[in-house]
A protein has these predicted regions:
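GST-like domain detector, emphasizing the conserved glutathione-binding G-site
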Residues: 1-132, 136
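Amphipathic alpha-helical packing segments from all-alpha helical-bundle domains
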Residues: 130-149
Length: 149
């Protein structure tokens, strides 16, 4: 298998952490340079038509996109240590916290960065006011998660 990743992007980092926690060693990793638009090349778009990272290319040539889908696939192949829960309560708690952190923290962080960082202006249209508001939401979420962890 081969994982297309990027050292500067948070979504592939989640998959890489998952792989490390599972102790999986047989996945080749190819890093794409987002700054050089390597994720927008025709070659990569054949793998991931939406140009998003990460992408996991399976040994049979199939492709899995999206962080959670990749992690769930790897969990099925490598069930130990279990990282998605073993009973209904664990599964629900893990899913709840993953969703909350994704929507309440990661999305505002991502939008704040994308809409306010000068480097990102070459990659997408920016709305500075929106970005600043998202950064405030992210800071509020970080304070909350600091208090509950």
């Amino acid at each position: 298998m081969k994982l297309y990743s990027s050292p500067v992007a948070p979504s592939p980092r989640k998959v890489l952490i998952f792989i490390a926690e599972k102790g999986i060693e047989n996945i080749e990793v190819e890093n794409l340079d987002i700054g050089k638009m390597e994720h927008k090349t025709p070659e990569y778009k054949e793998i991931a038509p939406n140009s998003r990272i990460p992408a996991l290319v399976l040994d049979d040539g199939g492709v899995i996109l999206e962080t959670t889908a990749i992690c769930r696939y790897l969990e099925c192949l490598h069930p130990e240590p279990n990282l998605f829960g073993t009973n209904p309560d664990e599964i629900a708690q893990i899913e709840m916290w993953y969703s909350r952190i994704s929507f309440e923290l990661m999305m505002p962080l991502m939008h704040g960065f994308r809409h306010t960082h000068p480097h990102m202006s070459a990659l997408e249209d920016q709305n500075n006011e929106f970005g600043l508001a998202q950064r405030e939401l992210a800071l509020k979420s970080m304070k909350y998660y600091d208090s509950v962890m």
